[in-house]
Amino acid sequence: MLRRALLCLAVAALVRADAPEEEDHVLVLRKSNFAEALAAHKYLLVEFYAPWCGHCKALAPEYAKAAGKLKAEGSEIRLAKVDATEESDLAQQYGVRGYPTIKFFRNGDTASPKEYTAGREADDIVNWLKKRTGPAATTLPDGAAAESLVESSEVAVIGFFKDVESDSAKQFLQAAEAIDDIPFGITSNSDVFSKYQLDKDGVVLFKKFDEGRNNFEGEVTKENLLDFIKHNQLPLVIEFTEQTAPKIFGGEIKTHILLFLPKSVSDYDGKLSNFKTAAESFKGKILFIFIDSDHTDNQRILEFFGLKKEECPAVRLITLEEEMTKYKPESEELTAERITEFCHRFLEGKIKPHLMSQELPEDWDKQPVKVLVGKNFEDVAFDEKKNVFVEFYAPWCGHCKQLAPIWDKLGETYKDHENIVIAKMDSTANEVEAVKVHSFPTLKFFPASADRTVIDYNGERTLDGFKKFLESGGQDGAGDDDDLEDLEEAEEPDMEEDDDQKAVKDEL
C-alpha cells in the first residue's frame, strides 16, 4: 500500500514538474509541455518570441496585462509564450520567421492555428480574442451592460435596434464580424436607448478621445458601417509607437502625413494643435501621425525619410501603396493653414514626389567603385556609352557588408576598362525615380544604350559570377527583381542586426 502511494506521488510530481509555469499570468511553454497546454485550454494564444527582440520586449507588459484581465474574468482564453530561440523545433513547426509571431489555437487544433493580426495593446489583444471566441456583437440587456462595454475599451460600437432581427440589425452584425479589434454591442432595450439619447434605431461609435462619440448617419449597410468606423476609430492625430504601429500600418487609410516633432521643443503644444486642426478636414482620407523625433526608437524612421534630429520639426507625407512614394511640403511653416493647403494640393495631384539625395562628394569618381547619389545617378547610370553595374545598399545591412570587399575587387578589376563602370549608391539616403529598391543589396545593370534598359542581377555574389555577368553583356546571372527580393526575405531573419530595420521597411 505504501509503495503504491509513493508511486502515485512520484507520478504526480513528474506531471507537475512538466506542467507550464506562469509569469505574470502568461503560461511559459516548451516542447515538453506544449501539447499538454493545448489539451488543457480550449482557447490558447501563443507568442513566439526572442529574448533579444525589441518588439517582443515592448509587447511583454501589454501581453501580460491582457492575460491578467482575461484570467480575472474567469475566461476560457489563456495566453502563453515560447522562447523560439530555445524551442527551435516548435518555431519551425509553426512557421516562425520573425519576432514576435503570435498564433491562436482553438480546441487543440495544431494544423491551422490563426495568425494574430490586431494591435499590440492589451485592449486590442482582449478584444480580438473575444471576437474570435464569442458572438460578433454582445447582447446588452440593460444600461449597466452598455456602460461596461463602452468603458472597457478605447473604442466600442453599439447598434441600437428595436427589432434585433431587422435587416438593418443583420447588416450591423455582418459589419461586426468583419472587425476583430473593436468590441460591438447590440441592444433593443428602451432604457439603453434613453441613456444614450436615441429615440430611433441607430449606430454609435464611442471613443475615449477627440469628440467622444460619433453617430452613424445614412443607410445601414455593412459597407457603409465599415466606412463609418474606418473614418472614426482612430484619433485625429495618432502618435507612432510600438503599440500603435499595427493600427497605423494595418488600417485602410494608406496615405499618411507625419509630423516629426520633439516633445522637448518649447512650442510643442502649439505645433501639435496646428497639426490636429489640419487633420479635421481629412478624416478618412489622410492619416495624421505624430512622431517624437527625439525618441531613440524613432531614429530609423527619420533616416527612412532622410531627416536628421536637428531638422525637426518637419512634415512629410507618404503613400503606402505597392510603390511607396514620399512627398515634402513646399513650405517649412507648420501652421494649420499651410499643412491643410499641402494636403489639398496632394489630393489634387499637384505635388511632385520628393526624392532624397546626398550631396555629391568631390571624390565620387576617384576610386575604382564610383559613388552615386540622387543628383548624379541619371548622368552616370544612363550614359549611352557606358555599361554601368550598380549596387544599391544600406549601411546597416549585413549582406551588404559581406559583399563590400567583393564589390571593391570587382571595381579594381574594371577600373581601367573603357566602357564598364562599377558603382554603388546608399539607398537609405538617395532615391531615384527610375529604380525602386525593395531589398538590400539590390544589383542592377545599365547597359550602354539609348533605351534606358535596366537588367536585374540574380546570380552568385562572387567575383567570378559578376565577371561572367559583365563579360556576357548582362546575360549570365540576369533575373527578375522579384526573385532577388524573395532571396533576401528568406535570408534576413537570420541576421539579428537587421531586425529593427526590417521592421521599419515592413511598416513603411
UniProtKB/Swiss-Prot annotation:
<keyword id="KW-0597">Phosphoprotein</keyword>
<dbReference type="GO" id="GO:0005576">
    <property type="term" value="C:extracellular region"/>
</dbReference>
<keyword id="KW-0472">Membrane</keyword>
<dbReference type="GO" id="GO:0009897">
    <property type="term" value="C:external side of plasma membrane"/>
</dbReference>
<dbReference type="GO" id="GO:0005856">
    <property type="term" value="C:cytoskeleton"/>
</dbReference>
<dbReference type="GO" id="GO:0019899">
    <property type="term" value="F:enzyme binding"/>
</dbReference>
<dbReference type="GO" id="GO:0016972">
    <property type="term" value="F:thiol oxidase activity"/>
</dbReference>
<feature type="site" description="Lowers pKa of C-terminal Cys of second active site">
    <location>
        <position position="461"/>
    </location>
</feature>
<keyword id="KW-0676">Redox-active center</keyword>
<feature type="active site" description="Nucleophile">
    <location>
        <position position="53"/>
    </location>
</feature>
<dbReference type="GO" id="GO:0005829">
    <property type="term" value="C:cytosol"/>
</dbReference>
<keyword id="KW-0413">Isomerase</keyword>
<dbReference type="GO" id="GO:0030027">
    <property type="term" value="C:lamellipodium"/>
</dbReference>
<keyword id="KW-0143">Chaperone</keyword>
<dbReference type="GO" id="GO:0005793">
    <property type="term" value="C:endoplasmic reticulum-Golgi intermediate compartment"/>
</dbReference>
<dbReference type="GO" id="GO:0003723">
    <property type="term" value="F:RNA binding"/>
</dbReference>
<dbReference type="GO" id="GO:0035722">
    <property type="term" value="P:interleukin-12-mediated signaling pathway"/>
</dbReference>
<feature type="short sequence motif" description="Prevents secretion from ER">
    <location>
        <begin position="505"/>
        <end position="508"/>
    </location>
</feature>
<feature type="domain" description="Thioredoxin 2">
    <location>
        <begin position="349"/>
        <end position="475"/>
    </location>
</feature>
<keyword id="KW-0225">Disease variant</keyword>
<dbReference type="GO" id="GO:0046598">
    <property type="term" value="P:positive regulation of viral entry into host cell"/>
</dbReference>
<keyword id="KW-0007">Acetylation</keyword>
<dbReference type="InterPro" id="IPR005792">
    <property type="entry name" value="Prot_disulphide_isomerase"/>
</dbReference>
<dbReference type="GO" id="GO:0046982">
    <property type="term" value="F:protein heterodimerization activity"/>
</dbReference>
<dbReference type="GO" id="GO:0034975">
    <property type="term" value="P:protein folding in endoplasmic reticulum"/>
</dbReference>
<keyword id="KW-0677">Repeat</keyword>
<keyword id="KW-0256">Endoplasmic reticulum</keyword>
<dbReference type="GO" id="GO:0004656">
    <property type="term" value="F:procollagen-proline 4-dioxygenase activity"/>
</dbReference>
<dbReference type="GO" id="GO:1900026">
    <property type="term" value="P:positive regulation of substrate adhesion-dependent cell spreading"/>
</dbReference>
<dbReference type="GO" id="GO:0034976">
    <property type="term" value="P:response to endoplasmic reticulum stress"/>
</dbReference>
<dbReference type="Pfam" id="PF13848">
    <property type="entry name" value="Thioredoxin_6"/>
</dbReference>
<dbReference type="GO" id="GO:0006457">
    <property type="term" value="P:protein folding"/>
</dbReference>
<keyword id="KW-0732">Signal</keyword>
<comment type="subunit">
    <text>Heterodimer; heterodimerizes with the protein microsomal triglyceride transfer MTTP. Homodimer. Monomers and homotetramers may also occur. Interacts with P4HA2, forming a heterotetramer consisting of 2 alpha subunits (P4HA2) and 2 beta (P4HB), where P4HB plays the role of a structural subunit; this tetramer catalyzes the formation of 4-hydroxyproline in collagen. Also constitutes the structural subunit of the microsomal triacylglycerol transfer protein MTTP in mammalian cells. Stabilizes both enzymes and retain them in the ER without contributing to the catalytic activity. Binds UBQLN1.</text>
</comment>
<dbReference type="GO" id="GO:0070062">
    <property type="term" value="C:extracellular exosome"/>
</dbReference>
<dbReference type="GO" id="GO:2000406">
    <property type="term" value="P:positive regulation of T cell migration"/>
</dbReference>
<dbReference type="GO" id="GO:0016222">
    <property type="term" value="C:procollagen-proline 4-dioxygenase complex"/>
</dbReference>
<dbReference type="GO" id="GO:0030070">
    <property type="term" value="P:insulin processing"/>
</dbReference>
<dbReference type="GO" id="GO:0015035">
    <property type="term" value="F:protein-disulfide reductase activity"/>
</dbReference>
<feature type="active site" description="Nucleophile">
    <location>
        <position position="397"/>
    </location>
</feature>
<keyword id="KW-1015">Disulfide bond</keyword>
<feature type="site" description="Contributes to redox potential value">
    <location>
        <position position="399"/>
    </location>
</feature>
